Swiss-Prot record:
One of its GO terms (biological process) is ATP synthesis coupled electron transport. It is an enzyme of class 7 (translocase). One of its GO terms (molecular function) is NADH:ubiquinone reductase (non-electrogenic) activity. Belongs to the complex I subunit 4L family. The chain crosses the membrane at residues 5-25, 31-51, 62-82. GO terms for cellular component: NADH dehydrogenase complex; plasma membrane. Its EC number is 7.1.1.-. It comes from Methylibium petroleiphilum (strain ATCC BAA-1232 / LMG 22953 / PM1). It holds the Pfam family Oxidored_q2. The keyword Acetylation does not apply. This is NADH-quinone oxidoreductase subunit K. NDH-1 shuttles electrons from NADH, via FMN and iron-sulfur (Fe-S) centers, to quinones in the respiratory chain. The immediate electron acceptor for the enzyme in this species is believed to be ubiquinone. Couples the redox reaction to proton translocation (for every two electrons transferred, four hydrogen ions are translocated across the cytoplasmic membrane), and thus conserves the redox energy in a proton gradient.
Length: 102
């Protein structure tokens, strides 16, 4: 039995659904939200790589590197906001983000 494109796509769909569920169930903790968004991006990347492999086109794999770059920048900015929020309010609750308005 070999692993087919359907296996990769179903795994990607399960990871994506898990991240969406994580976002909807926990909307208070900023760290969990960032992890769920990263899991969502990785599920999309898995689908891109699977399609790229099975279609023989390298464009999907190149696009994954761009997504990883944007995801790294998003994580850095999100963690910087988290540090500022924790220093000012001693909490990582998303509801406290309006306190950072200047």
């Amino acid at each position: 039995m070999s692993i087919t494109l359907g296996h990769y796509l179903s795994l990607g769909a399960m990871l994506f659904a898990l991240s969406v569920i994580g976002i909807f169930l926990n909307r208070k903790n900023l760290i969990v939200l960032l992890m769920a968004i990263e899991l969502m991006l990785l599920a999309v990347n898995l689908n891109f790589v699977a399609f790229s492999h099975y279609l023989g086109d390298m464009a999907g794999q190149v696009f994954v590197f761009f997504i990883l770059t944007v995801a790294a920048a998003e994580s850095a900015i999100g963690l910087a906001i988290l540090v500022v929020l924790f220093r000012n309010r001693s909490t990582i609750n998303v509801d406290e983000l309006d306190a950072l308005k200047g």
